């Protein structure tokens, strides 16, 4: 059994030597990196690295380049899964790694093209600078400014979109409220107009008008001119007739009580003109010698908005035309 190490307490064999393992790169790895990341073909790479000195310089930079590519991949994966208080640090580290990788790619391309002459000490100093995983203060400040600017732009865009949505919803609510309030207002105007008209005239629903034989059979009509201050309506009032003793008698009539009757014409002849001040129409006295009889069912009158029953087979005074 060998002796025990005083640091790690692991047994080790006597005369055992340990070597530090290094990430060894070969020419195949260099060609893969230059074709995949720099966009060069294999034939171009073979010609570019024909110079042995340039090939050695590229091989010295390649391990550092691959190490930072691996770190960048880890930062990309941790960006979405890390804790909230670590997001700013991960974002800063990602920007820093991208800056380092871009710088190394530029140096590698210039060395391969032969436009960049660097000594071995400069290559080692460059590798040490990037290997310490540190950047200058200006690089860190640039990364932080980029993060802050992105945060401000995102906040401004979100605020603008939110204000536009709130304004659109407010306009829609105002339009809907205007539509809902429009119908009652129109109804109120119609009701007010109806109330105004209802006070202008009234019609006695118990009065009976009998039309004599002089009206032609097949069409019975009474033309009533209704006028008031607001409108003029020409209403043609017709009904089904009943043939009694060779005459035509109106069996039903529609009388508009919400309008003032100014002139009544029966069979194109003016029979009477009621006084506009009177609220009821009174028929003139006529002899009761005509045998015509009014046969009336239900007469619907708009005055008062109710239907009244008129006795059937009621005899009344006849106005001969």
Curated annotation (Swiss-Prot):
Q: Name one Pfam family in it.
A: Herpes_U44
What are the entry keywords?
A: Host cytoplasm, Host Golgi apparatus, Lipoprotein, Palmitate, Phosphoprotein, Virion, Virion tegument
Q: How is it modified after translation?
A: Phosphorylated. Palmitoylation is necessary for Golgi localization.
Intrachain S-S bonds:
none
Q: Where is the lipid attached (S-palmitoyl cysteine)?
A: 8
Please provide, in alphabetical order, the Gene Ontology terms of the cellular component aspect for this entry: host cell Golgi apparatus; viral tegument
Which InterPro entries does this entry report, sorted A to Z? Answer: Herpes_U44
Name the source's superkingdom: Viruses
Subcellular localization, per the record? Answer: Virion tegument; Host cytoplasm; Host Golgi apparatus
Quaternary state and partners of this protein? Oligomerizes. Interacts with UL7 homolog; this interaction mediates UL7 homolog incorporation to virions.
Q: Which family does it belong to?
A: Belongs to the herpesviridae UL51 family.
What task does this protein carry out? Answer: Plays several roles during the time course of infection, including egress of virus particles from the perinuclear space and secondary envelopment of cytoplasmic capsids that bud into specific trans-Golgi network (TGN)-derived membranes.
Q: What is this protein called?
A: Tegument protein UL51 homolog
